[in-house]
Each structure stands twice: as C-alpha cells, then as structure tokens.
C-alpha cells in the first residue's frame, strides 16, 4: 500500500510546486512592492509637508500660543522649539517661560526643550537651575541639561558635573555631554573627574574626556590615565594660560530639499563662547572648526 501512496504524494507535490507555489511568490513580491511604494509615498508626503511648511511657517503669535497651551504638552513642546530658534526668543517674557518650564513642567520633552531654549538665550545665573536637572530621572532631560551647561559658564556647577560624569551608573549619553562641558573648567576637580572618565567602559566617554583634557592642558596622553595623573602631579602649572573652549555645534551635509528651498537657505550655528565666560581670556588661535560635528560617517 505504501508503494501506491508515494507516487500520489510525489505527483501532488509536483503540482503544488508548479502551479501553486509561484502564485504565493508573486503575491509576496506584490506585497513587498506595495510596502515599498507606501514607504516612499510616506517619505515623499513628509518631504512635501516640509516644503509646504517652508512657504507658510507658523506665525510668532501661533508659536507663542502653542508654547502657552496648558492642555497639550505637544503644543507646548512645538511652540517652545519655535520660540527658542527665533531671533527674538530671548526676550524677558520668553526667558521667564523657559525657566518656569525647566523648574515645574511635568512633561520631560517640554522640559528638555526649555533647557535647549535656556542654553541659547539664558544667562550665567541660569546655570544653577539647569544643573539641578542633571539629577532628573529622565535621560533626555539630563542630556539637555548637560548640553546647556556647555553653553552656560559657572564654576559653581563643576561639582555636580564631576559627580554625574564619574558615576558609571549614569547613562553614557549624559556622561559624554558632561565630559565636553568640563572642558571649560581649568580646575583640579575637573581634571580628576576627566581622568576617571578615561577609564570608564564606554569608548565614546573616553574620547570625550580625552578631548577635554587636551583642551585644558595642551597635552595628549591618549587614554592612559596613569600617564595623565603622573604628568599632572609633576607640573605645578598644568593648565593652559589661555582658554581654548568653544561650545560645540552640529552640522550636516545639505540634502536635496535643502538645495530646492533656495528662498530659505539652510544655515548652521557656529561654535561660540559660553555665556558667563570671560572672552578676553580666550586664545585668539581657537579654531571653531575643532568644535563642529560635521555629521559625516565616511
């Protein structure tokens, strides 16, 4: 009986492979093509939305209305971002709003955007308010606070920067930004914290700490903590006479739509001196290009 069944099974398998299986394959190909088209349509609609927005951006009144919306955190976030990036975003009324959101807003994204706004338009006296957010439970808030302290100079915040930077339980994205911020403080506690960060597990943290040490000392012992410390102990004046620090900025290569929207040319922020820092102590040879992230992965 088994000999009679096998030919039938083989015949059915052959029919399935010849007639039915190709249909499944073609259906699968159609599904894949459809998914690709839907994805490209979504991308194109997003690009066209950006193009439309560049023709008719929200008015200042609309941005302010969104930022002050007490019922919608997304509107608050969107409005705060628009105000922060406007030339007039540093007026006293808006500064008061940013400070209020940093201190009291319950939404972490709104708080992070307010920190970014204070970083752009704040004063040296805002450093303490910003530094408190390094103890926030939300990582995005802590990263925004650390980045803000790269732009706001106050030697009194070095203790909390050192504490966050040397805590290996802290998220590495926070410690990277802290290491960059410490590059503006030529002090023993900053140096010791940066040396400790060179020995941490994450390579990105190590490199950020080494960059700050090079800025502070004009020496480079790479990621050798022992060599850094022995050199430091042997020198009575280990730090540069002139400051080299500029807060870093981000740049990227222009894309297709950046060239199409010629009426709204894309510009990038240049590295600058943190508010509260004495610019007269800045070395004239400081090159802004050294503080730019060009966004290239080549």
Where are these regions (language model features)?
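Bacterial N-terminal signal peptides that target proteins for export
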Residues: 2-30
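Structural detector for internal amphipathic alpha-helices that build alpha-solenoid repeat scaffolds
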Residues: 45-55, 74-89, 109-123, 129-132, ...
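TPR/TPR-like (Sel1-like) alpha-helical repeat modules
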Residues: 198-203, 214-217, 226-236
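C-terminal motif of bacterial Sec signal peptides marking the signal peptidase cleavage site
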Residues: 38-40
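Amphipathic alpha-helical scaffolding segments comprising HEAT/armadillo-like alpha-solenoid repeats
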Residues: 51-67, 88-103, 123-135, 154-166, ...
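Pro/Ala/Gly-rich low-complexity, hydrophilic intrinsically disordered segments
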Residues: 224-258, 262-264
């Amino acid at each position: 009986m088994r000999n009679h069944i096998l030919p039938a099974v083989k015949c059915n398998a052959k029919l399935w492979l010849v007639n039915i299986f190709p249909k499944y394959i073609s259906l699968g190909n159609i599904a894949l093509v459809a998914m690709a088209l839907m994805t490209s349509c979504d991308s194109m609609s997003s690009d066209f939305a950006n193009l439309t927005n560049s023709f008719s951006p929200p008015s200042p009144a609309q941005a302010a209305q969104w930022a002050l919306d007490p019922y919608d955190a997304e509107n608050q976030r969107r409005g705060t971002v628009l105000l922060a990036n406007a030339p007039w975003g540093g007026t006293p009324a808006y500064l008061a709003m940013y400070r209020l959101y940093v201190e009291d807003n319950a939404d972490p994204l709104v708080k992070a955007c307010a920190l970014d706004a204070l970083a752009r338009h704040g004063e040296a006296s805002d450093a303490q308010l910003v530094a408190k957010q390094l103890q926030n439970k939300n990582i995005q808030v802590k990263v925004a606070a650390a980045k803000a302290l790269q732009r706001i100079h106050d030697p009194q915040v070095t203790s909390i920067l050192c504490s966050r930077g040397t805590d290996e339980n802290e998220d590495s994205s926070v410690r990277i930004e802290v290491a960059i911020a410490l590059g503006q403080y030529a002090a023993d506690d900053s140096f010791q914290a940066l040396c400790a960060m060179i020995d941490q597990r994450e390579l990105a943290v190590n490199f950020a700490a080494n960059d700050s040490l090079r800025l502070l000392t004009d020496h480079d012992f790479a990621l050798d903590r022992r060599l850094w410390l022995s050199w430091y102990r042997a020198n009575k004046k280990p730090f540069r006479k002139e400051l080299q620090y500029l807060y870093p900025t981000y740049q990227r290569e222009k894309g297709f739509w950046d060239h199409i929207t010629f009426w709204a040319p894309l510009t990038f922020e240049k590295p600058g001196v943190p508010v509260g820092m004495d610019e007269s102590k800045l070395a004239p040879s400081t090159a802004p290009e050294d503080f730019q992230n060009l966004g290239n992965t080549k």
